[in-house]
Design a protein with these regions (language model features):
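Hydrophobic transmembrane alpha-helices of multi-pass small-molecule transport proteins
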Residues: 127-146, 276-293
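Transmembrane alpha-helical segments that form core, pore/gating elements
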Residues: 18, 22, 26-34, 57, ...
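Specific transmembrane alpha-helical segments of multi-pass solute transporters/efflux pumps
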Residues: 27, 65-100, 105, 141-142, ...
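Helix-helix packing/entry segments at the starts of transmembrane helices
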Residues: 16, 48, 102-107, 174-193, ...
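C-terminal transmembrane-helix exit sites in multi-pass transporters
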Residues: 61-64, 108-133, 259-278
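Loop-to-transmembrane-helix transition segments
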Residues: 13-21, 61-88, 132, 155-163, ...
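Membrane-interface helix-cap regions at the ends of transmembrane helices
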Residues: 4-5, 53-69, 137-150, 193-220, ...
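Hydrophobic/small/kink-forming positions within alpha-helical transmembrane segments
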Residues: 26, 30, 79, 83-87, ...
Length: 299
C-alpha cells in the first residue's frame, strides 16, 4: 500500500531537490573520466570516489552506529540495490559514450512497468503498454536500429542498462521503506556501491578490474576527497527525495540529468549527438512522462 504523504511543501522541496540532484549527475561523468585518466580505469574510479565519501562521513557513521546496527539488514538490502545501480553506472561512464550510458540508464520506465506488473500486481493499461513500447523503441534507436543490429555494443552499454534495472527496483524499495533517516540511506547507498564495486574487482576480469598500483590510488585520493564537496549533496539530493516521492515521479524528475549530460558531453567531450540520439532521447523521455502522468490518471 502506498504511504500517505501530503502534497505540501515537503513533496515540493523534494521534487525541486531531485531536479537539482539529477542536473548534478549530468556532469558526474567529468570527474569519473578525470580519475580514470589518472590511471584508474573501469570500476576503480567509482571505488575511489565512494571510498572518499565514506571517509568524510566517518564521524556521522560513528555517531549513528547504534541506529545503523539496529537496522543493518534492511539498510544492507536497499543499499545493495541503489549501490549496485550507481556502481554499474559509474563504471559505464568510462567504458562507453556518455550519452549512451545516460540514455540506457533512463530506461527505468520500462523496468518500472515490469516491476509494477510482477511485484505490485498492477494492471497493464493502454498507457503502460504505450510507455513500454516507446521506451523499448527508444532503446533500439539509441543502439543503432537501421545501421547495425540494435544490441549493446560493449561492456559499458551492458553496465548502463543493468544499472537502470537496479535503480528501478531500488527506488521502489526506498519508497516502501519505513521511516529511516535519509542520511542513513545515503550511508547504505555508499556502502553498497563500494561493496558491489569490490565484488566486480574480484570477478570482473582485466577489462573491468585492471591491476592498479597503490600509489595511483593514493595520488587520486586527495582529488576524490575534494570532490566530496560536490558528490555528497548530489547523493543526498538523489536518495532523500526517493524516500518521499513515488518511483515513477523520481524517474521523471531525475531526467534533468539527460539534458545536462547530453549537452556537456557534446560540448566538452565532442561525443556525437545527431538525429538518431535525439530521436532516442525524445522517445525514452516520452515513455517516462507517459508512465508517471498515465499512472496519475488511473489512481
Amino acid at each position: 500500500m502506498p504511504k500517505s504523504i501530503s502534497a505540501g511543501p515537503t513533496q515540493l522541496t523534494a521534487s525541486i531537490g531531485l531536479v537539482i540532484g539529477g542536473a548534478m549527475w549530468g556532469v558526474y561523468w567529468i570527474p569519473v573520466r578525470v580519475i580514470a585518466d589518472m590511471g584508474l580505469p573501469g570500476v576503480w574510479a567509482g571505488v575511489v570516489l565512494y571510498l572518499a565519501a565514506l571517509i568524510v562521513l566517518l564521524p556521522i557513521i560513528w555517531i549513528n552506529r547504534k541506529s545503523l546496527l539496529s537496522k543493518w539488514q534492511t539498510l544492507l538490502f536497499v543499499g545493495f540495490l541503489t549501490g549496485a545501480a550507481f556502481s554499474l553506472f559509474t563504471t559505464s561512464l568510462s567504458m562507453t559514450d556518455v550519452v549512451r550510458a545516460i540514455l540506457l540508464f533512463y530506461l527505468t520506465p520500462v523496468w518500472g512497468t515490469l516491476l509494477g506488473l510482477m511485484v505490485l500486481g498492477e494492471r497493464l493499461t493502454i498507457t503502460r503498454v504505450s510507455a513500454l513500447v516507446l521506451g523499448l523503441c527508444g532503446l533500439l534507436v539509441v543502439l543503432g536500429l537501421g545501421q547495425k543490429f540494435p544490441w549493446p555494443q560493449n561492456i559499458g552499454d551492458w553496465l548502463a542498462l543493468s544499472s537502470g534495472m537496479f535503480w528501478a527496483y531500488g527506488s521502489m524499495k526506498l519508497y516502501q521503506m519505513e521511516k529511516i533517516a535519509a542520511s542513513e540511506q545515503v550511508l547504505a547507498f555508499l556502502f553498497g556501491s563500494l561493496l558491489v564495486s569490490g565484488f566486480i574487482l574480484l570477478v570482473g576480469g582485466p577489462e573491468l578490474a585492471a591491476k592498479v598500483d597503490i600509489n595511483v590510488i593514493l595520488n587520486a585520493m586527495p582529488y576524490a576527497l575534494l570532490l566530496t564537496i560536490y558528490l555528497l549533496p548530489m547523493f543526498y539530493l538523489t536518495i532523500w527525495p526517493a524516500t518521499l516521492l513515488a518511483p515513477g515521479r523520481v524517474g521523471v524528475l531525475l531526467m534533468s540529468e539527460i539534458v545536462v549530460g547530453v549537452i556537456t558531453a557534446a560540448v566538452i567531450s565532442g561525443e556525437p549527438f545527431g538525429f538518431r540520439e535525439a530521436l532516442g532521447t525524445v522517445m525514452i523521455v516520452s515513455a517516462a512522462l507517459l508512465e508517471i502522468f498515465g499512472a496519475r490518471k488511473t489512481t
